[in-house]
Structures are given as C-alpha cells and as structure tokens.
Amino acid sequence: MERLDKAALNALQPPEFRNENSLAATLKTLLFFTALMITVPIGLYFTTKAYIFEGALGMSNRDSYFYAAIVAVVAVHVVLALFVYVAWNEGSRQWREGKQD
C-alpha cells in the first residue's frame, strides 16, 4: 500500500521540481560558452594580428586586419560547434535519465 502511495505522489510532482540540478547545469554551460564566445574570438583577433601576422609574417597593418578577422570568425564557429555538441549530449543524457525513471 505504501508503494502505491509513493508512486502516486511521484506521478503528481511537476517535472520542473524533479530536475533543478539539470537547470543549474544547463545555466552553467550556457554562461561558460557565453564567456568563451566573447573572449576567444576577441583574444585571438588581437593576438594573431599583433604577434603572428604583423610580427612573425611581417604583413602590413591592413592585411593583418583582414586575416585576423578571418581567424576570429573561425573561432566563433568553433565555439558554436562545441556548444551544440555539449548541448546535444547533455540533452540526450537527461532524456535517457528521465526515461529510466
């Protein structure tokens, strides 16, 4: 009889109260990739412009702007691809855990 009561109580609980940890983990993941989206392209832009294209390769100021911008755009796409990969795996993991309940 007690098992039936516990099963009924678990069925009546709203789903948002069962997955508070997954919401916090999702928010942490989102904030982490937001920080990456801001810092990585900007950092790579100025680093590659100053040290690689102008410093090591001896390019002009105008050419180094162009190539550093390409590096920054590629970095944005890499961060986005990593975010999609992590979000996809996190969602499928939560789906599997929910399916086992």
UniProtKB/Swiss-Prot annotation:
Keyword annotations: Cytoplasmic vesicle, Endoplasmic reticulum, Membrane, Transmembrane, Transmembrane helix
Main location: endoplasmic reticulum
Regions of this protein lying in the Lumenal compartment: 47-65
Membrane topology: Multi-pass membrane protein
An annotated GO cellular component: endoplasmic reticulum-Golgi intermediate compartment membrane
One Pfam family hit: VMA21
Annotated TM spans: 26-46, 66-86
Source superkingdom: Eukaryota
Compartments, as annotated in UniProt: Endoplasmic reticulum membrane; Endoplasmic reticulum-Golgi intermediate compartment membrane; Cytoplasmic vesicle, COPII-coated vesicle membrane
Ranges in the topological domain labelled Cytoplasmic: 1-25, 87-101
A GO biological process held by the record: vacuolar proton-transporting V-type ATPase complex assembly
Family to which the UniProt record says this protein belongs: Belongs to the VMA21 family.
Reported function: Required for the assembly of the V0 complex of the vacuolar ATPase (V-ATPase) in the endoplasmic reticulum.
Quaternary structure note: Associates with the V0 complex of the vacuolar ATPase (V-ATPase). Interacts with ATP6AP2.
PANTHER family linked: VACUOLAR ATPASE ASSEMBLY INTEGRAL MEMBRANE PROTEIN VMA21
Protein name: Vacuolar ATPase assembly integral membrane protein Vma21
